[in-house]
Every structure is written in structure tokens, then in C-alpha cells.
């Protein structure tokens, strides 16, 4: 069994359902400390975070390449639906099964072993290797990576490159990497009306009827055209509720939850202003509460993307696709202190599902790609 596969199984065997790390980071710390890393545990409200650094011969003047990832996993779902226990690694038909196999314990193991091989081959490496690991990525993500980034900002610590080990591939290892993510902003809209008997509409004010024209306009709006890296911004309703449940009562208010997934072609302030303008144009009496869970970030083609593309092509023969599709990730926090952030990991077809798995044939090539990137950028 390869070193990467063995470490992956060791991590899967820890039932680290968010935010419980279950000593996964301790396993990693023991390996990294033996390599000469300085490891710091940063705890916050039940969340375990790890910041580990190994300086190269250039010291703080050298380039810093960080690997960011998470040890927490999503809940298993109904255990009886699993073909084998989710926290007992199992091999079937060339696949390794277990919760976290794809998201993202294989990536964690791969970068640890890649670092071990890199340091052994390049003991005098010039640049710095770092790990930023959290147990709060699958949960609220309020005490994990964002807290470590805030601490690093306060210390004046910088990163030059960061690989986030998210499972970005689709069918083959390396067919897709993420060089950015859209921003996410939600709104809670309450449109006020006047409750009354449905037989006497002149004595009431129906908020559903008032909202409908504005809702149609919001749904039809072209928010932007996207750009080279991002598709156009989207606006979607996730929840719409009004009424008491009775068939003879005009409701007193209508509640609408909606979400923007927005590109770098739009801003938070600009989108909010346009929504308010549409609501105001229709004369609505309303309250609107905004929440921004992440800003868009983008890493244009450059050193990190080039090194990763070269490594993937050398290892797999695949020409990778740079993409910004999908949901948010911890990359949105890291982009605040790192100009080049790219996500790359194994295929994601089984993540968060019953019988999550990874094809064993991808495990060591993933490690090799990570090692090749280290060799290109900080050797």
C-alpha cells in the first residue's frame, strides 16, 4: 500500500463530522513536525485549526506556497444505506470507500506525502511550504479558515500561492481546476400589506399582488454579462411564503428569500442598489436584510495556474480546464492575503453522498501533481 493511500485510510477512520476534528490534525502534525514544520494549533469555539510552516533557505524573503484544506466531513446520512461503515475504509472494485474519501482526506494525505517526498529530494529548498487546515469548512465556516486568515493578516504574514484541496475534478483527475469562485449574497425581503377578509379586498392590501410585478422584473433582470472567467450573475428565489394557511384571509405580509451568485463584473453595492431601485419603483413598503457569505475571487493565468497545468499534463496527459463554476469555498477567505489561489483535487461525483469514494488509481497521481507543483515553484 502506498504511503498516500495508507494515510488517507488513517484519516478516513476518524469520524470527524464537522466541527469535530477527531485528532486528524494531530496525525498530520506528527508527520509535519518530523519534517521540520513549526506547527501551531488555533482553536476557536470548538473548531480546531492548524497553521504549519517550513521555511526554506530564503527565509521570509522566499516564496510561500500554502496548502489549504479541511479535516471535517459532512454527516453520514442513514448508516443502513451505506454498503460498508462510513468510517471504516473499505476497498471494492478499485475504489476506496468512506466518508471524506473524496472530500477531502485524500487531498490532505496527498499533500503531506508530497511534502515529505519534496523535502527529501530538495533538503535545501528555497521557498516556504505551509499548511492551513480547519475543521470548520463543512459547517458555518465562521471559526475556521477565516479566523486563521485574520490572525495571519494581523501578523503581517503573506502567501504567494495557495492550493485548496477541494475535489474539483469531474471524471478524470485534473480535468477541471478552479481558479476562482463566484460571490454569494442573500436577501431576506418582507413586503408589508394589510391583512383582511378575502371577500373584502378593498379593506385589505394583498402583499402577494403587490410583490408579483417586482418579482417578475427581478427574475427577468440581466445583472451583468459575466466576463472571460465568469458566467453572468444569477438571481434566484429560494423561498416564498405568505398567508396564514386559511383560504379566506388576505395575508398581512409576504416573505421572500433570494440569492445572488455574482461575478467580478458586479459589486455588492451595485447589486443591492439595483434591487432597491426595482422595489422602490413598484411602490412597495418593505424591509430587506442582506447577508454576504463570500466575495468573488479570481486568479488569472500566471505562475500557479501554469505550474499546476504543467504538473497535471505531465502526470496524467490531460489538458486541464480552468473554471469558476460551483459554490463557495474557503478560497474566498484566503484570497484576502494571497494573490494566487487555485483549487485542485480528485473527482467530486460522490462527495456528500452515501458510499462516498475515490478511485484508487487517482490517489498517487494526485500526490505526484502536488509534488511537481512544489518542485516548480519553491525548489
UniProtKB/Swiss-Prot annotation:
Textual note on the cofactor: Binds 2 Zn(2+) or Co(2+) ions per subunit.
One of the GO biological process terms: L-arginine biosynthetic process
Residue ranges of the TM segments: none
Keyword tags: Amino-acid biosynthesis, Cobalt, Diaminopimelate biosynthesis, Hydrolase, Lysine biosynthesis, Metal-binding, Zinc
Binding site for Zn(2+) 2: 103, 138, 352
Catalytic activity: N-succinyl-(2S,6S)-2,6-diaminopimelate + H2O = (2S,6S)-2,6-diaminopimelate + succinate
Cofactor field: Zn(2+); Co(2+)
Zinc is among the record's keywords: yes
One of the record's GO molecular function terms: cobalt ion binding
Pathway info: Amino-acid biosynthesis; L-lysine biosynthesis via DAP pathway; LL-2,6-diaminopimelate from (S)-tetrahydrodipicolinate (succinylase route): step 3/3
EC number: 3.5.1.18
Binding site for Zn(2+) 1: 70, 103, 166
Annotated function: Catalyzes the hydrolysis of N-succinyl-L,L-diaminopimelic acid (SDAP), forming succinate and LL-2,6-diaminopimelate (DAP), an intermediate involved in the bacterial biosynthesis of lysine and meso-diaminopimelic acid, an essential component of bacterial cell walls.
Record note on quaternary structure: Homodimer.
Official protein name in the record: Succinyl-diaminopimelate desuccinylase
Organism: Burkholderia lata (strain ATCC 17760 / DSM 23089 / LMG 22485 / NCIMB 9086 / R18194 / 383)
Amino acid at each position: 500500500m502506498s504511503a498516500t493511500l495508507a494515510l488517507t485510510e488513517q484519516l478516513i477512520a476518524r469520524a470527524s463530522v464537522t466541527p469535530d476534528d477527531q485528532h486528524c490534525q494531530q496525525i498530520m502534525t506528527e508527520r509535519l513536525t518530523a519534517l521540520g514544520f513549526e506547527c501551531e494549533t488555533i482553536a476557536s469555539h470548538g473548531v480546531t485549526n492548524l497553521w504549519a510552516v517550513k521555511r526554506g533557505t530564503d527565509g521570509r524573503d522566499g516564496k510561500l506556497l500554502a496548502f489549504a484544506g479541511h479535516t471535517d466531513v459532512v454527516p453520514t446520512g442513514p448508516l443502513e444505506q451505506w454498503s460498508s461503515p462510513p468510517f471504516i475504509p473499505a476497498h471494492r472494485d478499485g475504489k476506496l470507500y468512506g466518508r471524506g474519501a473524496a472530500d477531502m482526506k485524500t487531498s490532505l494525505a496527498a499533500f503531506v506525502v508530497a511534502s515529505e517526498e519534496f523535502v527529501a529530494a530538495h533538503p535545501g529548498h528555497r521557498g516556504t511550504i505551509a499548511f492551513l487546515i480547519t475543521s470548520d469548512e463543512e459547517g458555518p465556516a465562521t471559526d475556521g479558515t477565516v479566523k486563521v486568515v485574520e490572525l495571519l493578516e494581523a501578523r503581517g504574514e503573506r502567501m504567494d500561492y495557495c492550493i485548496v484541496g477541494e475535489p474539483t475534478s469531474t471524471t478524470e483527475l485534473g480535468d477541471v481546476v478552479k481558479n476562482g469562485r463566484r460571490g454569494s449574497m442573500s436577501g431576506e425581503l418582507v413586503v408589508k400589506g394589510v391583512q383582511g377578509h378575502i371577500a373584502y379586498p378593498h379593506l385589505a392590501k394583498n402583499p402577494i399582488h403587490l410583490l408579483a410585478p417586482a418579482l417578475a422584473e427581478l427574475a427577468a433582470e440581466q445583472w451583468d454579462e459575466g466576463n472571460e472567467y465568469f458566467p453572468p450573475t444569477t438571481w434566484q428565489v429560494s423561498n416564498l411564503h405568505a398567508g396564514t394557511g386559511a383560504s379566506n384571509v388576505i395575508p398581512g405580509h409576504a416573505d421572500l428569500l433570494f440569492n445572488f451568485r455574482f461575478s467580478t463584473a458586479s459589486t455588492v453595492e451595485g447589486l443591492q442598489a439595483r434591487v432597491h431601485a426595482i422595489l422602490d419603483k413598484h411602490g412597495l413598503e418593505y424591509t430587506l436584510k442582506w447577508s454576504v457569505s463570500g466575495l468573488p475571487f479570481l486568479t488569472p493565468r500566471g505562475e500557479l495556474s501554469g505550474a499546476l497545468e504543467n504538473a497535471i499534463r505531465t502526470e496524467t496527459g490531460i489538458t486541464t480546464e480552468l473554471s469558476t463554476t460551483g459554490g463557495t469555498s474557503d478560497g474566498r477567505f484566503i484570497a484576502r492575503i494571497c494573490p494566487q489561489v487555485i483549487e485542485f483535487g480528485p473527482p467530486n461525483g460522490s462527495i456528500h453522498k452515501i458510499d462516498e469514494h475515490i478511485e484508487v488509481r487517482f490517489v498517487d497521481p494526485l500526490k505526484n501533481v502536488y509534488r511537481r507543483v512544489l518542485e516548480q515553484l519553491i525548489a
